[in-house]
C-alpha cells in the first residue's frame, strides 16, 4: 500500500490514492487539479523521507467542492460590568480527492 504524508493548509495529512480529504480553502474551481507537497512517502516496506527524493514526488488531487465548516460560537463575558460580546466563525474548507502519488 502506497501512502504519503502531505502538507496542506499548515497541517499534515496522511493520504493514499482515492481518499477524500477536507483541507483549508484551496484556490481553484471544482474539477481542477492541485499538487500537494509530500513530506514522507511509504511504499510497502520502503520509507522515503529524504528531501531531494521527495522533490520528485508528485501528489495530485482533484478539487471536489468548496464548503464551510460548522459554526463556532465565541462568547466573552466580564462579571458585574455588563460587558458581553458574542462572535461566530465558520472556516472556509475544500474537499479534494487524491488522484495520484507519482514517485
UniProtKB/Swiss-Prot annotation:
GO biological processes: translation
Domain of life: Bacteria
Pfam families: Ribosomal_L21p
Physiological role: This protein binds to 23S rRNA in the presence of protein L20.
Name of the protein in question: Large ribosomal subunit protein bL21
rRNA-binding among keywords: yes
Assembly and interaction partners: Part of the 50S ribosomal subunit. Contacts protein L20.
InterPro entries: bL21-like, bL21-like_sf, Ribosomal_bL21
Name of the coding gene: rplU
Keywords linked to the UniProt accession: Ribonucleoprotein, Ribosomal protein, RNA-binding, rRNA-binding
GO molecular function, one term: rRNA binding
Protein family: Belongs to the bacterial ribosomal protein bL21 family.
Gene Ontology CC terms: cytoplasm; ribonucleoprotein complex; ribosome
Amino acid at each position: 500500500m502506497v501512502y504519503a504524508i502531505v502538507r496542506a493548509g499548515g497541517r499534515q495529512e496522511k493520504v493514499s490514492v482515492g481518499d477524500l480529504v477536507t483541507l483549508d480553502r484551496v484556490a481553484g474551481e471544482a474539477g481542477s487539479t492541485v499538487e500537494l507537497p509530500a513530506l514522507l512517502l511509504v511504499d510497502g516496506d520502503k520509507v522515503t523521507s529524504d528531501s531531494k527524493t521527495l522533490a520528485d514526488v508528485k501528489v495530485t488531487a482533484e478539487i471536489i467542492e468548496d464548503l464551510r465548516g460548522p459554526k463556532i460560537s465565541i462568547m466573552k463575558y466580564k462579571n458585574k460590568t455588563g460587558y458581553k460580546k458574542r462572535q461566530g466563525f465558520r472556516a472556509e474548507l475544500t474537499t479534494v480527492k487524491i488522484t495520484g502519488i507519482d514517485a
